[in-house]
Design a protein with these regions (language model features):
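Non-transmembrane, aqueous-exposed alpha-helical and coiled segments at domain scale
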Residues: 1-128
Length: 128
């Protein structure tokens, strides 16, 4: 079983939102992982992904890392290496400034973790 509650906060002009990803059986989980492969295929073709695809990619990253028994601190510290601003559509880095996860995975206790500015914007410029 995979149960992920993701709370997203962005810039002040972007309303916060919550998404719940729940996959109770192997079939549902396979659909989730197949959708992640489609997103990775888009990235491999140098196509930019949107907010929902970016959030799904981070959820997949969290699941993979927790199943590999990686520490929460390491997961949080490495989140900024998952996506760069040139791989996402305009506005995605501003929308995903902070992502807080509550994750129940298989029969393990609930884990909580947060990503702060997971998409680095140091070389990111909006044209006016």
């Amino acid at each position: 079983m995979i149960l992920i509650k993701a709370e997203v906060k962005g810039e002040s002009d972007v309303p916060p939102f919550t998404r719940v990803f729940e996959y109770r059986d192997k079939f549902d989980q396979q659909i989730f992982f197949d959708s992640l492969e489609k997103i990775k295929d888009k990235l491999a073709k140098n196509l930019r992904i949107n907010t929902n695809e970016s959030l799904a990619l981070y959820c997949g990253y969290v699941v993979d890392q927790l199943r590999a028994r990686i520490s929460i601190e390491s997961i949080e510290n490495n989140a900024a290496k998952i996506l760069l601003s040139d791989k996402v559509m305009i506005g995605v880095p501003e929308t995903l400034r902070r992502i807080s996860f509550e994750v129940i995975l298989d029969n393990f206790p609930k884990k909580k973790l947060s990503f702060h500015e997971p998409i680095p914007t140091s070389h990111y410029t909006l044209a006016v």
